């Protein structure tokens, strides 16, 4: 599956100018969806400034560039979801893919989902909010709504992925530690032609009953395959408030 030549080589020599996720106005998607060329200068310059803050993040960014399937394991705040979504946005706006598909399990909803007010979209919104937040921070809420209306961005719970084949897409599976082995296997087989998939999660923070999460086992089985990247981030890669890393070591 390794297919793209790395554009990082020269940039790695100087992290202060490391800008791998911005190619303004290139490719058909940039025209079809308005591209970044139509965005205000403030937003375009902000998009250009995504940079790795650690060796682990640097390895993840390189893997996202080179592999069709990447599994990113790491604690909260290590940047795995944000970097995956940043790569997805770049792939869409540069024309490498035609759409972004973001999915995560709605574990907390469970059987109580039916008691929540509103239509299904309203019921699921709180559980998909972290994905909206990452997109909004990346390209702005107005742009996110526009791309979702056009069908260029889809955010859905994992249950909605069954039976689909996702071609020409960048797929991010977030919070995969809350998926069973069977669910992750099902999701991996959704990968279609000309697509990239990223699976992110922290095996140490699952909300499932002990032994039910399949993320750790899936990562172990996939790691020997050279066509697939398995990146393991650690507390050293956390870029949230310094207290987060400290708390994770004792809680």
Each language-model region and where it sits:
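Conserved coupling/interface region of RecA-like P-loop/ASCE motor cores
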Residues: 218-251
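Catalytic acidic motif of RecA-like/P-loop NTPases
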Residues: 77, 159, 177-178, 204
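Interdomain "pre-motor" coupling segment immediately N-terminal to P-loop NTPase/helicase cores
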Residues: 1-39
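Pre-Walker A adenine-sensing motif
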Residues: 50-67
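Conserved P-loop
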Residues: 71-78, 82-152, 209-224
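Conserved P-loop NTPase nucleotide-binding/switch module
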Residues: 106, 110-117, 170, 179, ...
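Loop/turn-to-beta-strand initiation segments
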Residues: 96-98, 150-153, 167-170, 184, ...
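Conserved helicase/translocase P-loop NTPase motor core
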Residues: 147-164
């Amino acid at each position: 599956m390794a297919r793209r030549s790395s554009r990082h080589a020269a940039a790695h020599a100087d992290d202060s100018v490391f800008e791998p996720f911005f190619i303004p106005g290139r490719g058909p998607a940039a025209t079809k969806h308005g591209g970044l060329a139509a965005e205000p200068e403030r937003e375009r310059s902000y998009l250009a400034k995504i940079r790795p803050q650690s060796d682990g993040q640097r390895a993840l960014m390189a893997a996202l560039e080179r592999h069709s399937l990447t599994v990113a394991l790491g604690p909260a705040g290590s940047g795995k979801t944000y970097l995956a979504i940043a790569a997805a946005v770049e792939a869409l706006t540069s024309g490498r893919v035609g759409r972004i598909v973001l999915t995560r399990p709605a574990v907390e909803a469970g059987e109580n989902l039916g008691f929540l007010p509103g239509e299904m979209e309203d019921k699921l919104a709180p559980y998909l909010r972290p994905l909206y937040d990452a997109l909004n921070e990346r390209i702005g809420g107005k742009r996110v709504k526009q791309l979702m209306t056009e069908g260029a961005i889809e955010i859905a719970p994992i249950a909605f992925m069954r039976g689909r084949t996702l071609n020409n897409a960048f797929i991010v599976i977030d919070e995969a530690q809350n998926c069973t082995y069977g669910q992750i296997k099902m999701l991996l087989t959704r990968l279609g032609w000309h697509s990239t998939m990223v699976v992110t999660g922290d095996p140490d923070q699952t909300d499932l009953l002990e032994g039910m999460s399949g993320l750790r086992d899936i990562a172990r089985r996939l790691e020997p395959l050279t066509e697939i990247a398995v990146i393991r981030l650690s507390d050293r890669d956390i870029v949230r408030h310094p207290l987060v890393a400290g708390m994770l070591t004792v809680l």
